[in-house]
Curated annotation (Swiss-Prot):
Ranges that cross the membrane: 12-34, 49-71, 91-113, 128-150, 162-184, 194-216, 245-267, 282-304, 317-339, 359-381, 388-410, 415-437
Species name: Bacillus licheniformis (strain ATCC 14580 / DSM 13 / JCM 2505 / CCUG 7422 / NBRC 12200 / NCIMB 9375 / NCTC 10341 / NRRL NRS-1264 / Gibson 46)
Full protein name: Probable multidrug resistance protein NorM
An example molecular function term from Gene Ontology annotations: antiporter activity
Keyword list, A-Z: Antiport, Cell membrane, Ion transport, Membrane, Transmembrane, Transmembrane helix, Transport
């Protein structure tokens, strides 16, 4: 990371950081896509089971991992303020927090999986597959959260290409493991949807160990000597992380759990509808990787500039990121319109699932446009360490506006399952508007304060 003088330099540095993050996010998303697609080749029940399992796991993981993303603005601002010596302490305390979070998830899951699944109106076979999937993926919870800390540290230094390479290594590992455990090839047990969870867990162990080795041994990370000094657990330092991380985590949880809630509310529909909904949602999640990557990039560059008190530069980066995300969303909207039948065909061989997935994809087109505005703004606000408003916005727009609208339309009109998607679009649009005005206010406040 370095100071930039004009828009061209900013664009060059922004893209240098963004492109590896985008590839990394797409790669991580492809792990879930591979789970879904390959499970769907076994049976519709396996596809639906993985869909339900993912819907329960994803909001929990993304919300708790969101707490750990506080590492990024904290380290970025330390680097901008030239306080490199404080970085190792922050990273180690974050690893302690990651371990505590992992233990809490494992213990909670042990007691809650059965009651939650029993209260869902699921076909017996689908419920069994969902439980097996969750148990298997739980074996990789600890390394996944530790990897998140390592990734945030690496990315906050602007070295996003490193995490990109780690992710690219993980894809063939996950594909091969899926091939072995889902289908039972080469003498391995045929586990179906559960095999997808086991494959992902093993993959998480691999990327965690690789990242730890790189941080410990490779330039420029080893010069920080992250593991060179033993630091005991500090409640005070952990609270600094949690003060920033908890609002981020809950905001992400409210956003991702709304999609999970919709899937669960749709559980009374038939297996074809659930499978089609999940297939379309998986593809929409893949498209979301660009605005999410822009968001993560903005947290790094805005945090760096804010730490250095260059607030006009941080504002310029914010609008650059939003422009890139919106431009890409318009392009992907065109792709969906032209190739939705081919996209649907990637997810299912069943004719009924394919036809219904095509219709769901049209709704995905609209809410990814709102994501292109909301996600980058969230990233910019996190760079300023302004996280509480994002939390409130997520709660109101998704749960107080989006979900009720979706439930009413989905339950009491002829739109049926599509009504829930209309609710999602409404919530995302409301959130985007609220976040935009917040960003303007924060930017003006910092610039005005600096000019006094």
């Amino acid at each position: 990371m370095r100071e930039t003088k004009d828009l061209r330099e900013k664009a060059r540095q922004f893209l240098t950081i963004l492109i590896p993050i985008l590839i990394t996010q797409a790669g991580l998303s492809l792990i879930t896509v591979l789970d879904t697609v390959m499970s769907g080749k076994v049976s519709a029940a396996d596809l639906a089971g993985v869909a339900i399992g993912s819907s329960l796991w994803t909001p929990v993981y993304t919300g708790l991992a969101g707490i750990l993303t506080a590492v990024t603005p904290m380290v970025a601002q330390l680097m901008g303020a030239k306080r490199q010596k404080d970085v190792p302490y922050t990273v180690i305390q974050s690893i302690y927090v990651a371990g505590i979070i992992s233990l809490a998830v494992i213990v909670s899951g042990y007691f809650l999986i059965d009651p939650v699944l029993e209260n869902l109106d699921l076909e017996r076979k689908v419920a069994v597959i969902a439980k097996q999937y969750l148990i298997c993926i739980g074996l990789g919870i600890l390394p996944l959260f530790v990897y998140n800390v390592m990734r945030c540290f690496i990315d906050s230094l602007g070295k996003t290409r490193v995490t990109m390479l780690i992710t690219l290594c993980s894809l063939p590992i996950n594909f091969v493991l899926n091939y072995l455990f889902i289908f039972g090839n080469f003498g391995f047990p045929k586990l179906g949807g559960a095999g997808a969870g086991l494959a992902s867990a093993i993959t998480y162990w691999c990327i965690c160990l690789i990242s730890l080795y790189i941080v410990h041994k490779k330039t420029p990370f080893h010069q920080f000597r992250i593991f060179g000094t033993f630091y005991s657990f500090s409640f005070a330092e952990s609270m600094k992380l949690l003060k920033i991380g908890i609002p981020i985590g809950f905001a992400i949880f409210f956003e991702t759990s709304i999609f999970a809630a919709v899937t669960l509310l749709m559980s009374h529909f038939d297996t074809v509808t659930i499978a089609s909904h999940q297939a379309a949602m998986n593809f929409a999640s893949l498209l979301y990787m660009l605005p999410l990557s822009v968001s993560m990039t903005l947290t790094i560059v805005v945090g760096f500039e804010a730490g250095a008190k260059r607030f006009k530069d941080s504002r310029a980066y914010s609008y650059l990121g939003i422009s890139i995300a919106v431009g890409f969303s318009l392009f992907t909207a065109l792709i969906i319109l032209l190739f939705r039948e081919q996209i649907a065909g990637l997810y299912a061989a069943d004719r009924d699932v394919l036809l219904l997935t095509k219709d769901f994809l049209l709704y995905a087109l609209f809410f990814q446009l709102s994501d292109a505005i909301a996600a980058p703004i969230q990233g910019a606000l996190r760079g300023y360490k302004d996280v509480n408003y994002t939390l409130v916005t997520a709660l109101v727009s998704y749960w107080i506006i989006g979900l009720p609208v979706g439930f009413v339309i989905g339950t009491y009109t002829s739109f049926g399952a599509f009504g829930y998607w209309i609710g999602l679009i409404t919530g995302l649009a409301a959130g985007a508007v609220g976040l935009f005005f917040r960003l303007k206010r924060i930017q003006n406040r910092y610039i005005h304060t600096q000019s006094m």
